[in-house]
Every structure is written in structure tokens, then in C-alpha cells.
Amino acid sequence: MILGLGMDVVEVARIERILAGPPARVDRFLERCFTARERAYCDAARDRATRYAARFAAKEAASKALGAPAGIRFTDVEVVRGAGAPVLELAGVAATAAARLGVRRVLVTLTHDGGVAAATVVLDGEEAR
């Protein structure tokens, strides 16, 4: 049963502008929004801004799917590489909200084209009673 659905779109140029900013501001943004694993994955790529944009979109989409729970942090939602497909790992407030909803599986898809990155998140499970 689908318990939640979220979608978000991010302009890659917006992330490029942030990454081109003063180093202290860039570091604050990256540490606030992305886990160490996400930063390592994105920083290893030529298309760094595109990878960050897709992951940012996934975090926003997950928050929407969860009902935008109070206190959720960007790092509560982590995009990791699965066996050929991205996987979302939830922690903190995101994990608590998912458990409360009865979520058993989190599905995510990422895409990018034409200067935008997008993500869709589907929460699957049995409705909590």
C-alpha cells in the first residue's frame, strides 16, 4: 500500500552557484545538507553539482512523502548507491516518522536533464493502526 508520495525538482545552476561561493559557506551548506558518504560520492564526480542537486531533490521529496515532519534534518535522509539503483536510508526524525506511518520500503528514483535534477519517493507499507 502506498503510504506517501513526494516529488521535487532542483535547478542544477542553483547548486552550482552555491558550490562556487565562499569556501566557509560551501562547507556549511554541504555539512548541513549531505552526509559524509554523499559528499564523498558527489565530490568524486565531474558532474558534482548535478549529483548534489539530485540528492537534494531526493531529500525534499522524502520529506514531502513523510508529511514534512517537524524537526526533520536534511541528513536524516541519505541517498546511497544500491545494486545499480539509488537507495534511501532514513535516520532520526525521518526514521521515526516512517515507523509511525508503517513504512516498510522506501523507493526512490533520481533523474537529471536539461539543467534540472528531479527525484520521486514512494513510501510503501501497511498503514499503522
Swiss-Prot record:
Name this protein carries in UniProt: Holo-[acyl-carrier-protein] synthase
What species does this protein belong to?
Anaeromyxobacter sp. (strain Fw109-5)
Cofactors that this protein relies on: Mg(2+)
UniProt keyword Membrane present: no
Q: Which reaction does it catalyse?
A: apo-[ACP] + CoA = holo-[ACP] + adenosine 3',5'-bisphosphate + H(+)
- Chief location of this protein within or outside the cell: cytoplasm
What keywords appear on the UniProt entry?
Cytoplasm, Fatty acid biosynthesis, Fatty acid metabolism, Lipid biosynthesis, Lipid metabolism, Magnesium, Metal-binding, Transferase
Instruction: Please name the InterPro entries in this protein's record.
Output: 4-PPantetheinyl_Trfase_dom, 4-PPantetheinyl_Trfase_dom_sf, ACPS, Ppantetheine-prot_Trfase_dom
Q: Which GO terms describe its biological process?
A: fatty acid biosynthetic process
Q: Which residues form a coiled coil?
A: none
Q: Which Gene Ontology molecular-function terms are recorded? A: holo-[acyl-carrier-protein] synthase activity; magnesium ion binding
